[in-house]
């Protein structure tokens, strides 16, 4: 994960001070890309411990089309609590857009099922895309999508994915995002009998919050360790049938966790 630390340093060295929606203040750069070869290890940050339980359960929650935090709470995941209303609802966030994008004619489009069918039946298509950025529903969402648009690409029997993230909290959010989409690529590759290729991350407003500077310098002082390996223990009938216990990370030996406040 050397490229992640290099991004942190780049934001420190080249970032512009900007105000933001949360009132916290950031150092920000615009436009950055990282590429992770998923055959060389699972891209889970090692310079601090990442909460893998939250990453896995959040992705499974997205894939079910869920937008209420009840499932997350049942599994001791609290990462969405700050944005939920008193009933645990978040509005039409990621899960709704992935699984039930509302069309003008009243249909609801399941983008994940569409993508799975494309990967199996038309893998050379240049339209294997999922978007969470539904302009007509942004004002109903508790939080507008940060990781907003992703595309799959098949070549030489390998499945790759590129994500466009319009807003990126480099210290807290980005390690989750990288691991989550890497996990999704592994799951989709298994379902389609493909090998994994690359995960390409592209960031728009890529920033460090002003109250994460001490933590960032601490993390930069640490030496990255070997990447772990993801093991998927079974092949379910569909992309929607995975369970938390299907996943195991082997050889994850991170430095201790580093706490930091969330900008809401």
Curated annotation (Swiss-Prot):
It catalyses: dUMP + (6R)-5,10-methylene-5,6,7,8-tetrahydrofolate = 7,8-dihydrofolate + dTMP. It holds the Pfam family Thymidylat_synt. It comes from Citrobacter koseri (strain ATCC BAA-895 / CDC 4225-83 / SGSC4696). (6R)-5,10-methylene-5,6,7,8-tetrahydrofolate binds at residues 51, 169, 263. Its EC number is 2.1.1.45. The active site is at 146 (nucleophile). Keywords: Cytoplasm, Methyltransferase, Nucleotide biosynthesis, Transferase. HAMAP family: Thymidy_synth_bact. Belongs to the thymidylate synthase family. Bacterial-type ThyA subfamily. This is Thymidylate synthase. GO terms for biological process: dTMP biosynthetic process; dTTP biosynthetic process; methylation. DUMP binds at residues 21, 126-127, 166-169, 177, 207-209. Catalyzes the reductive methylation of 2'-deoxyuridine-5'-monophosphate (dUMP) to 2'-deoxythymidine-5'-monophosphate (dTMP) while utilizing 5,10-methylenetetrahydrofolate (mTHF) as the methyl donor and reductant in the reaction, yielding dihydrofolate (DHF) as a by-product. This enzymatic reaction provides an intracellular de novo source of dTMP, an essential precursor for DNA biosynthesis. Homodimer. PROSITE patterns: THYMIDYLATE_SYNTHASE.
């Amino acid at each position: 994960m050397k490229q992640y630390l290099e991004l942190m340093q780049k934001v420190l060295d080249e970032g512009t001070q900007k105000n933001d929606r949360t009132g916290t203040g950031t150092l920000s750069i615009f436009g950055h890309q990282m590429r992770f070869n998923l055959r060389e290890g699972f891209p889970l940050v090692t310079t601090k411990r990442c909460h893998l339980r939250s990453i896995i359960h959040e992705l499974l929650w997205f894939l079910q089309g869920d937008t209420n935090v009840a499932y997350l709470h049942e599994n001791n995941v609290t990462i969405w609590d700050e944005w939920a209303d008193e009933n645990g609802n978040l509005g039409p966030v990621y899960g709704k857009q992935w699984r039930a994008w509302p069309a003008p004619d009243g249909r609801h489009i399941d983008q994940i099922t569409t993508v799975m069918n494309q990967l199996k039946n038309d893998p050379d298509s240049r339209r294997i895309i999922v978007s969470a950025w539904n302009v007509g529903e942004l004002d109903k969402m508790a939080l507008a999508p940060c990781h907003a648009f992703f595309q799959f690409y098949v070549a030489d029997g390998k499945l790759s994915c590129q994500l466009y993230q319009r807003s990126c909290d480099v210290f807290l959010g980005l390690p989750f995002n990288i691991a989550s989409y890497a996990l999704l690529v592994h799951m989709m590759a298994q379902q389609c009998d493909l090998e994994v290729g690359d995960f390409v991350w592209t960031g728009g407003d890529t920033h460090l919050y002003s109250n994460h500077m001490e933590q960032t310098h601490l993390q930069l002082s640490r030496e990255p360790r070997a990447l772990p390996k993801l093991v998927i223990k079974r092949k379910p009938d569909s992309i929607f049938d995975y369970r938390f216990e299907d996943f195991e990370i082997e050889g994850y030996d991170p430095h201790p966790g580093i706490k930091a406040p969330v900008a809401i």
